[in-house]
Amino acid sequence: MMQPADIVAQMRQLIQLIAKHNHAYYVMDQPSITDNEYDQLFHQLKALEAEYPELTQADTPTNRVGGQALSKFETVTHAVPMLSLGNVFNQEDLFAFARRIEERLPNQQIQYDVELKLDGLAISLWYENGVLVRGVTRGDGETGEDITQNVKTIRNLPKHLQHHSVETPRFLEVRGEVLMPKQGFERLNAANEAKGEKTFANPRNAAAGSLRQLDPAIAASRPLAFYAYGIAQCEPHHGLGSMHESLQWLTQLGFEIAERQFLCSSIQEVQQCYEQIQQERPDLAVEIDGMVIKVDDLKQQQQLGFLSREPRWATAYKFPAEVAMTTVENIDWQVGRTGTLTPVARLQPVFVGGVTVSNVTLHNIGEIHRLDVRVGDRVSVYRSGDVIPKVEKVWPEFRPELAEIVQLPEQCPVCSSPVVMPEGEALARCSGGLYCAAQRIEAIRHFVSRKALDIEGLGDRWVESLLHLDLLKDVADIYHLHEHREQLLTIEKMGEKSVQNLMDAIEASKKTTLARFIYALGIRGVGETTARMLANTFQTLDALKQADIEALKKTPDVGDITAEWIYDFFLAEHNIEVLDRLLAAGIHWDAPLAPTRQPLNGESWVVTGTLETMGRDEATQRLQALGARVSGSVSSKTKCVVAGEKAGSKLDKAEKLQIRVMNEQEFLAFLAQYSA
């Protein structure tokens, strides 16, 4: 049975991966994985949270949408959040979606509005008295970027709403998708290639990149198109009763909608539409990656309501992946931040899923053996949408006679440290830790992060420059950068003031806490909570370094596997060398005066709503200091819920489960008794 710490570690890993891919997709317009691969990560996290709701992390992306807005455009708050959609991938999932709706709307006739799922960039358009006044990207669903000047250059997008048979609303907010039709995309890439300029990987990247140009003239030169898919706000209310009517009304105002739209009276008809569009997909003028199914009746939509990040009344029905055959030319090993060795198949380039694929991750040695993939093999490569491609099938009948079974390397390909793979684990790791160059940059990023040593200003640009100058071989070198001041001044855009600010931040970081220091070391499986538990239990770094596995296992929040990871970390000689150098550089923390009182040790608490006297982060920290585990969701294991203003569904669930609830004043009084 998995220990809570291991479950949390798995959740944290998924959250970090999803955040990374959200940033690549929504902010950088450079998707790093396909939609199917992203969906798999997302569903893994949702499944863990459903099974262990008390361990749900506060920053889980299952309660958010998309990525953060870029700083170069003005940030705009959406009055009505721009939510994403849930996904279904087959007929069974589709019928389950319909059953959930029917259970919530018993004895009601349900019609479904079915539309193309356009592969573009979602935006919101604001009209006042029929005049376009603002265009905003979806961003993180709550806030987006003001791209008004760029959207005004889109040729088919109405700047003035006028129609003799339709009264123009005082205010109208229309949601839709900006994309680049296939022919326009091909012409743009051909022109760029002829001029020796960068070409785009796919139409979505081209559309998103065009909208985020600071110069509207660039957007104007691109063949962009806008297709409306819904109304967010309308004053006075439009009085329409269905999605189908809403879209037709928008066309009367001058908006274009996707070239296919269906009104289905049963979920079986929806499936038939899906199969029809799948056949017609190659002939469509635009790229699509599935279909969107919505309950057509707007009143029924209101009855069904929303989950935290998606409507209950709509879902996206994704198309299946595409497959192509190619040859494995080589298999090599890459080393990640935590030392994980990942085998990568180098392929004879093959066009699949709209892109040319030449590299595919094989994940781990177990997957290699499961597939029995070898150098020289013919393989089927699977790719759907923007999902990272993968090897789906090996064809042994085409295997070369001398093809050898792939073995796990005994030494790290980067630093030559021994490779270890504990019994029962799927992943092999370099044991080099802080010594390994491949792990170095991510280890440094983690070490300087806000929740670790919090060295303000030591961002990626600094780190990359310092690595290039060979001034950072490990995290301890950070505290010797003052010895290289003249070299630092040679870095582009790093003047005297920037260098001094960095020196000041490094000096300030020397005063920390034992818990922060333990967390900063980046020991596998040791997050903030575990680091705090280790600090409270062992009180000193020396005691932690000398602890055996049995002592570590007795620490709250530390399971058997994490205990072994901690023990192995402090057993590695090169890690101890780095620790000694950090301490010699002056990193210190207050000595423990007495064992920390933790009256809430082991209890699960939830903080929800808005608190007037403190933020939720501070409330969480106060509870954690008393030993509580602060969860993002309410379950039968929850001890107490602290409810501020607009507490919402968590308060409702707590009352339903008869869990103790404190208002803000009661919570402050509760904390006061431990403030002496």
From Swiss-Prot:
<dbReference type="InterPro" id="IPR033136">
    <property type="entry name" value="DNA_ligase_CS"/>
</dbReference>
<dbReference type="Pfam" id="PF03119">
    <property type="entry name" value="DNA_ligase_ZBD"/>
</dbReference>
<keyword id="KW-0234">DNA repair</keyword>
<dbReference type="GO" id="GO:0006260">
    <property type="term" value="P:DNA replication"/>
</dbReference>
<feature type="binding site">
    <location>
        <position position="436"/>
    </location>
    <ligand>
        <name>Zn(2+)</name>
    </ligand>
</feature>
<keyword id="KW-0464">Manganese</keyword>
<dbReference type="GO" id="GO:0003677">
    <property type="term" value="F:DNA binding"/>
</dbReference>
<keyword id="KW-0460">Magnesium</keyword>
<keyword id="KW-0520">NAD</keyword>
<dbReference type="GO" id="GO:0006281">
    <property type="term" value="P:DNA repair"/>
</dbReference>
<dbReference type="InterPro" id="IPR013839">
    <property type="entry name" value="DNAligase_adenylation"/>
</dbReference>
<dbReference type="GO" id="GO:0003911">
    <property type="term" value="F:DNA ligase (NAD+) activity"/>
</dbReference>
<comment type="function">
    <text>DNA ligase that catalyzes the formation of phosphodiester linkages between 5'-phosphoryl and 3'-hydroxyl groups in double-stranded DNA using NAD as a coenzyme and as the energy source for the reaction. It is essential for DNA replication and repair of damaged DNA.</text>
</comment>
<dbReference type="Pfam" id="PF00533">
    <property type="entry name" value="BRCT"/>
</dbReference>
<dbReference type="InterPro" id="IPR010994">
    <property type="entry name" value="RuvA_2-like"/>
</dbReference>
<dbReference type="Pfam" id="PF01653">
    <property type="entry name" value="DNA_ligase_aden"/>
</dbReference>
<keyword id="KW-0235">DNA replication</keyword>
<feature type="binding site">
    <location>
        <begin position="84"/>
        <end position="85"/>
    </location>
    <ligand>
        <name>NAD(+)</name>
    </ligand>
</feature>
<dbReference type="InterPro" id="IPR001357">
    <property type="entry name" value="BRCT_dom"/>
</dbReference>
<dbReference type="InterPro" id="IPR004149">
    <property type="entry name" value="Znf_DNAligase_C4"/>
</dbReference>
<feature type="active site" description="N6-AMP-lysine intermediate">
    <location>
        <position position="117"/>
    </location>
</feature>
<feature type="binding site">
    <location>
        <position position="294"/>
    </location>
    <ligand>
        <name>NAD(+)</name>
    </ligand>
</feature>
<dbReference type="InterPro" id="IPR001679">
    <property type="entry name" value="DNA_ligase"/>
</dbReference>
<dbReference type="InterPro" id="IPR004150">
    <property type="entry name" value="NAD_DNA_ligase_OB"/>
</dbReference>
<comment type="similarity">
    <text>Belongs to the NAD-dependent DNA ligase family. LigA subfamily.</text>
</comment>
<keyword id="KW-0227">DNA damage</keyword>
<feature type="binding site">
    <location>
        <position position="177"/>
    </location>
    <ligand>
        <name>NAD(+)</name>
    </ligand>
</feature>
<feature type="binding site">
    <location>
        <begin position="35"/>
        <end position="39"/>
    </location>
    <ligand>
        <name>NAD(+)</name>
    </ligand>
</feature>
<dbReference type="Pfam" id="PF03120">
    <property type="entry name" value="DNA_ligase_OB"/>
</dbReference>
<keyword id="KW-0436">Ligase</keyword>
<dbReference type="InterPro" id="IPR036420">
    <property type="entry name" value="BRCT_dom_sf"/>
</dbReference>
<dbReference type="InterPro" id="IPR013840">
    <property type="entry name" value="DNAligase_N"/>
</dbReference>
<dbReference type="InterPro" id="IPR018239">
    <property type="entry name" value="DNA_ligase_AS"/>
</dbReference>
<keyword id="KW-0479">Metal-binding</keyword>
<dbReference type="Pfam" id="PF22745">
    <property type="entry name" value="Nlig-Ia"/>
</dbReference>
<feature type="domain" description="BRCT">
    <location>
        <begin position="595"/>
        <end position="676"/>
    </location>
</feature>
<feature type="binding site">
    <location>
        <position position="138"/>
    </location>
    <ligand>
        <name>NAD(+)</name>
    </ligand>
</feature>
<dbReference type="InterPro" id="IPR041663">
    <property type="entry name" value="DisA/LigA_HHH"/>
</dbReference>
<protein>
    <recommendedName>
        <fullName>DNA ligase</fullName>
        <ecNumber>6.5.1.2</ecNumber>
    </recommendedName>
</protein>
<dbReference type="InterPro" id="IPR012340">
    <property type="entry name" value="NA-bd_OB-fold"/>
</dbReference>
<dbReference type="Pfam" id="PF12826">
    <property type="entry name" value="HHH_2"/>
</dbReference>
<dbReference type="GO" id="GO:0046872">
    <property type="term" value="F:metal ion binding"/>
</dbReference>
